[in-house]
């Protein structure tokens, strides 16, 4: 389901790059959250509870290892190099005969697929999902993790996520200044 949503967002945001693409993606996430909070078919803003706790540390660790390995192999593959070429120079890649539209949409789908795996793990870890928890600030925090680690680097994104996840614990004594650290 996440991959299908990635295709839809990818098609909608096809002509955008950089900051504008991030803004549209975050806006789409906010629209989905508001829909989940307000439509009766999704249960409104109620908590979806009763999810089995299947996220044990060893299971999550091995899922993470498999996902990171697949992403690493993807980045090193011909497909991954093509996506990197599009990222570096959109016009040159297009002039070289690369179907930029196809690669951008499929990359969105693949990214959304892995995000969906993360969401599934999170749901099983929390055993309940509250739509209001996935607000704009949470999206901005996730985007910050990627930016701090480096947008073109898989290892950097992992380090950025680990750093910003550990930062609240490291800065517990200075909790009133937490947002100041994020602004830097």
Question: Would you name each region that the model predicts?
Answer:
Residues 1-184:
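Transmembrane alpha-helices and adjacent helix-loop boundaries
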């Amino acid at each position: 389901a996440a991959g299908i949503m990635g295709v839809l967002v990818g098609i909608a945001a096809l002509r955008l790059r950089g900051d504008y693409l991030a803004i549209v993606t975050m806006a789409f996430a906010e629209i989905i959250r508001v829909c989940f909070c307000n439509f009766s078919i999704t249960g409104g803003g109620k908590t979806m509870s009763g999810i089995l706790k299947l996220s044990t540390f060893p299971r999550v660790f091995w899922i993470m290892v498999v996902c990171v390995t697949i992403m690493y192999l993807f980045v090193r593959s011909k497909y991954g190099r093509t996506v990197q070429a599009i990222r570096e120079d959109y016009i040159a890649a297009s002039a070289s005969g690369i179907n930029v539209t196809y690669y951008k949409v499929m990359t969105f789908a693949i990214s959304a697929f892995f995000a969906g795996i993360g969401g599934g793990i999170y749901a099983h870890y929390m055993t309940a999902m509250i739509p209001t928890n996935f607000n704009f600030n949470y999206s901005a925090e996730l985007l910050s993790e990627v930016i701090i680690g480096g947008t073109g680097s898989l290892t950097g994104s992992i380090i950025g996520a680990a750093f910003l996840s550990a930062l609240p614990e490291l800065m517990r004594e200075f909790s009133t200044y937490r947002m100041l650290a994020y602004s830097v």
